[in-house]
Design a protein with these regions (language model features):
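Conserved aromatic anchor
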Residues: 23-34
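Short beta-strand elements
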Residues: 94-118
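Short beta-strand segments within Ig-like beta-sandwich modules, predominantly Fibronectin type-III
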Residues: 51-59
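An aromatic-rich alpha-helical recognition segment common to small helix-rich domains
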Residues: 12, 29, 40, 62, ...
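A recurrent domain-boundary module in secreted/ectodomain proteins
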Residues: 1-7
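Beta-strand-rich modules
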Residues: 66-99
Length: 118
């Protein structure tokens, strides 16, 4: 497959969540050949205000601190996008926003996490 933009995202597969508690979940996916960074998009099911996070590994822990609120009892949808480029920024959110400049909208299939109530 020929990519016109060398920073264009690649399709991420096998997104899964493990170790789900009321306050956190570990999310992992298959590494993408040539990918050096990933953007994680997540949001509460049925709401439109998705959030972004950035990782340079094929894993991410979503917890109350990252979410900036309580996850207990929520259903959260997670999507991942892979990039060849390593992005810079003041924090993981700024890096994710920088990656979206190269966005070709190649998100993984959804991984839905049902956080148990406390």
């Amino acid at each position: 497959m020929l990519l016109l933009n060398p920073n264009a995202p690649r399709k991420v597969t096998n997104v899964k969540s493990t170790n789900i508690t009321p306050t956190s979940a570990e999310i992992s996916w298959n590494s993408v050949t040539g990918a050096n960074s990933y953007v994680i998009r997540y949001g509460v099911d049925g709401q439109t205000n998705d959030r972004l996070h950035y990782s340079e590994t094929a894993s991410f822990t979503l917890d109350d601190a990252v979410f900036a609120g309580e996850l207990a009892g929520l259903k959260v949808n997670v999507y991942i996008q892979a990039f060849e480029k390593i992005y810079t920024g003041s924090d993981e959110i700024a890096k994710a926003n920088a990656a979206m400049v190269d966005n070709a909208n190649v998100w993984s299939n959804v991984c839905t996490i049902d956080f148990p109530s406390k």
